[in-house]
A protein has these predicted regions:
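Glycine-centered hinge/linker elements that transmit conformational signals in sensory
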Residues: 201-205, 238-266
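Short, well-ordered beta-strand elements
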Residues: 59-71, 93-98, 120-121, 165, ...
Length: 432
């Protein structure tokens, strides 16, 4: 992008309406280890115009701090790239980013909110968005961003009581990855239903190779991977002690009982699961878009492909990704100006392409991966991707769900009992 254009863009972004804040001055979360301020070499962004958006006021100037939790070097470099480009093309706003480990995110946010020491923008995991919005930490930006072309799931994750408290950064979803050679050797087709998945997983299990796995950690990461089973039955995230919820737990148990699903998966992150798959220890797995760049680089000769997650009654996938949120009472106008730039078409495409994400803007996503059949499966599945929550109490609800499937996988509880226990916790949280 030309220097002259970005300067004009920022000036235009400074021309109009005043942002409506939603609460007291506070600031945003931090994620990943070693809080460090990013400075990286500047690279060049696409030499095309940034899209216009609802302008900010004349007061857009000063420093803007962003908190983020990505620990992957490529993610950090991509964010730094657009920040350095933005800073280098105008002199009214200076943006800097600070990394905080994901494990420390909630603690840092809570402490920062109490002490009045928060940033101006936060990039956060989308299921956590509603809980922070309910605390009054995020600014209401309903009238500042047009999200009519965004996928419903990402927008819902930014919305509370009909108001928009953030903008989707980028999205990802889950699909079935499969080893083509292992399925062919077992004489199996790609499974489309639960029954077919159980059959194929059983037939491809032999020696040290398990037929199927997904991350089953007792935390949000595990819940993310488990919930597509529940949604596929037609139940919601809050209906675990239901016909469909129990059926989902029973299906998980059937995979374990068949010896096709490793109990060790309760200790596996999504990255661990991917490593097991590319090492030849899994025939199939559930995982997301962000693994593709690594897989293509590390195992270029491995024959693998992707397909929709096998279904019960209906197709379902889990919506992942992050959102941007502006901190109420921070440097809101300058934060808005930067986010207008960051969410414009060419800047968004740069970020998505370098991070393996799908744009949350459907008009961008539909052309993002033309010619790439693997990524296109993920794009097609976005219409079936469900957001976790969004409720302010979601983190506690997620804990109850992950405890349930963990107990079933380890054999510490049967599906019906685990579902009843989880439901009792969920009902107490949402006030039923």
């Amino acid at each position: 992008m030309k220097k002259r254009f970005l300067a004009t863009f920022v000036s235009a972004v400074m021309l109009a309406t005043v942002l409506t804040g939603c609460g007291a001055a506070t600031q945003a979360p931090a994620q990943e280890t070693a809080a460090k301020e990013e400075t990286a070499e500047t690279t060049e962004v696409a030499d095309t115009q940034t899209e216009e958006a609802v302008p900010a006021s004349d007061d857009a100037s000063g420093d803007v701090t962003i908190w983020y939790y990505w620990e992957t070097a490529g993610h950090q470099e991509a964010l730094d790239h657009i920040i350095q480009e933005f800073n280098g093309q105008q002199d009214k706003i200076k943006v800097q980013a600070k990394y905080v480990p994901f494990a420390d995110f909630k603690k840092q946010l809570s402490v920062g909110a109490s002490a009045g020491e928060l940033p101006d923008i936060v990039i956060l995991d989308n299921p956590d968005h509603a809980s922070y919005a309910a605390m009054g930490i995020f600014a209401d930006i309903t009238d500042r961003f047009d999200v009519s072309n965004y996928y419903p799931g990402p927008v819902n994750s930014c919305t509370l009581d009909g108001k928009l408290y953030g903008v989707p950064f980028g999205s990802n979803d889950l699909v079935l990855f499969y080893n083509e050679d292992m399925l062919a050797e077992a004489g199996c087709e790609v499974p489309k239903t639960w029954d077919e998945l159980l059959d194929v997983a059983t037939k491809t299990t032999k020696g040290n190779v398990y037929g199927f796995a997904h991350c089953a950690l007792q935390n949000e990461e595990g819940t993310f991977n488990f919930l597509p089973w529940v949604w596929s039955t037609g139940q919601t995230s809050y209906e675990i002690n239901s016909e469909g919820g129990i059926k989902a737990l029973e299906f998980e148990k059937s995979l374990v009982d068949a010896g096709a699903f490793p109990k060790e998966a309760i200790n596996w992150t999504q990255g661990d699961t991917m490593n097991q798959f590319i090492s030849g220890n899994l025939a199939m797995m559930i995982n997301g878009t962000w693994q593709i760049p690594t897989m293509r680089q590390e195992v270029p000769d491995l024959k693998w492909n992707v397909a929709p997650i096998p279904q019960d009654k209906q197709q379902a996938s889990g919506l992942g990704g992050e959102n941007y949120a502006v901190i109420a009472g921070g440097n809101e106008e300058a934060a808005i100006a930067f986010l207008k730039y960051a969410t414009s078409k060419d800047t968004c495409l740069y970020m998505m392409d370098h991070m393996g994400y799908i744009s949350s803007d459907s008009t961008i996503a539909k052309d993002q991966f033309k010619g790439d059949a693997v990524y296109q499966v993920f794009v097609d599945e976005m219409q079936y991707a469900n957001a976790r929550g969004p409720l302010p109490e979601w983190p506690d609800i997620s804990d109850a769900i992950s405890l349930a499937f963990n107990k079933v996988i380890t054999g510490d509880s049967d599906p019906a009992s685990a579902a009843a226990e989880a439901q009792a916790t969920i009902d107490s949280i949402i006030g039923k």
